[in-house]
A protein has these predicted regions:
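Amphipathic, non-transmembrane alpha-helical secondary structure
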Residues: 5, 104-107, 111, 248-256
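Extended amphipathic alpha-helical scaffolds
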Residues: 1-35, 197
C-alpha cells in the first residue's frame, strides 16, 4: 500500500496493534539497482529534513516509535504530522511519549545498505536524550560489514540534526570521500545551535517535567523558558522571559550575539502546529542575517513536540567556525542532485 498510516488507523479501530512494519520497497529497489553515490546517509525520524532530500535514493530513515496509551506508531512512516497533532490533542490526560527504534530496525537497514554502498553514515538523535544511538551501535555487532558503517551522535534533535543532514547530503552528492564527510559532520555537530521557545507550559506540567507548583508560579508571572541543546546534547534552559512574544525577540537577539547583525549561516525552523510563528522567524532571520541556503520550515518531530506541546518553535543555525569557516563547507545551495526516479515495485526484494 502507498498509505500505511491509513491501513494502521483502520486496523487500530479493531484492537491494539502489537507490531508495525513499513518498508519503502521502491526506494530499496532504487538503492539496489540505481545507486549513484558511494555513501548512503541514514537518519532517524527525530531528524527533521525536507521531503525533497528524504526522497533521494541514498537517504534512508529509521522511524522512532511514538506511543499514545497502549498504541505505538512508526513516526513519519505511518504517522503524519496531521494525525500526530490529532492524537496529541485527544490524549489530554496521558501525554504521548517516544521510544527508540528496535535494534533490529537498524540491523536490517545497515545490512541492506552495506550490500549496495561502499560506506554508510548514520546521524543519530542526541545520545543524551535517547537510547537511539545505542540501539544503532548494538546493531553493528550483528552485521558482517560493520567497518563500513559510521555512527555519529548529532547531539541534537529536529531541525538541528536536519541542518547537519542537509550538508551531509550535499557532500555525498559531490562525491566527497567518507573521511571528509565524517569530518565535516563532526565539525557541524559542535557548531549547531538549537533555540526553542515554548508559549505554553501545559505540556511540561502534564508530563511532570515541570512541577505543578513551579508551573503555577511561572504562569502567574508569565514566565516562559527558552531552551537549548548544550555541548553534551542535553536540553537545558537558555533563559527565562516574560511572555511568548518576548521569547521570540530574545531568540533573534541570541542569534545576533552569536553571528552578529548580517551574519551568514544556515538556518531552519521547526514548529508544533504553528506555521505562523515559523514564518515570523523566517522573516526576521532574512531581515537581520544572511542565510547561506534556503530556510526550510518543518513540523517538529514528536521527539520534541510530545514534550513541549502546541505552539512550540525551534530555530537551528550553525555558529561560525573558530577558524573563519569550516573547510568542509559546500558551495552549493542545497538543491544539487535529483530525487530517485520511479521504479517498478519489487516486493520480494530488499529488507525483509
Amino acid at each position: 500500500t502507498d498509505d500505511p498510516e491509513e491501513v494502521f488507523r483502520i486496523a487500530g479501530e479493531y484492537g491494539v496493534l502489537s507490531q508495525q512494519k513499513v518498508d519503502d520497497m521502491e526506494k530499496q529497489y532504487q538503492a539496489a539497482h540505481a545507486a549513484d553515490t558511494e555513501t548512503a546517509l541514514v537518519v532517524d525520524s527525530a531528524c527533521d529534513l525536507p521531503e525533497e532530500l528524504m526522497k533521494k535514493c541514498f537517504v534512508h530513515m529509521v522511524p522512532v516509535r511514538v506511543i499514545f496509551g497502549e498504541q505505538s506508531y512508526l513516526d513519519k512512516s505511518a504517522l503524519s504530522p496531521a494525525r500526530f497533532y490529532e492524537l496529541l490533542r485527544s490524549w489530554t490526560d496521558t501525554p504521548g511519549t517516544t521510544s527508540q527504534p528496535a535494534t533490529g530496525d537498524f540491523e536490517k537497514t545497515f545490512a541492506f545498505l552495506t550490500a549496495h554502498y561502499k560506506s554508510v553514515v548514520y546521524l543519530g538523535l542526541s545520545e543524551a536524550l535517547s537510547g537511539t544511538v545505542a540501539s544503532a551501535r548494538s546493531a553493528l555487532g550483528r552485521i558482517k560489514a560493520k567497518e563500513a558503517v559510521s555512527i555519529i551522535d548529532s547531539k541534537n534533535v529536529t531541525v538541528g540534526a536536519g541542518l547537519i543532514a542537509r550538508r551531509a547530503v550535499e557532500w555525498i552528492e559531490a562525491g566527497r570521500p567518507i573521511e571528509a564527510i565524517r569530518a565535516g559532520i563532526e565539525d557541524l555537530v559542535e557548531r549547531t545551535r538549537l533555540l526553542i521557545t515554548i508559549p505554553s507550559l501545559d505540556a511540561l506540567i502534564r508530563s511532570g517535567r515541570l512541577g505543578k507548583t513551579r508551573g503555577l508560579i511561572a504562569e502567574l508571572l508569565r514566565l516562559r523558558p527558552l531552551l537549548t541543546i548544550d555541548g553534551q546534547g542535553k536540553v537545558v534552559k537558555a533563559a527565562m522571559v516574560h511572555g511568548a512574544e518576548a521569547g521570540k525577540e530574545r531568540i533573534i537577539s541570541m542569534i545576533r550575539s552569536s553571528l552578529g547583525e548580517g551574519g551568514k549561516s544556515d538556518f531552519a525552523v521547526a514548529h508544533v502546529d504553528n506555521r505562523e510563528i515559523a514564518e515570523w522567524f523566517r522573516a526576521r532571520i532574512e531581515e537581520h542575517f544572511n542565510p547561506a541556503r534556503n530556510i526550510f520550515i518543518l513540523d517538529a518531530s514528536p521527539a520534541l513536540a510530545t514534550h513541549t506541546g502546541f505552539g512550540t518553535a525551534a530555530v537551528a543555525y550553525f555558529e561560525p567556525s573558530g577558524e573563519g569557516g569550516s573547510a568542509q563547507e559546500a558551495d552549493s545551495d542545497g538543491t544539487a542532485g535529483t530525487a530517485c526516479t520511479a521504479a517498478p515495485d519489487r516486493t520480494g526484494e530488499g529488507i525483509e
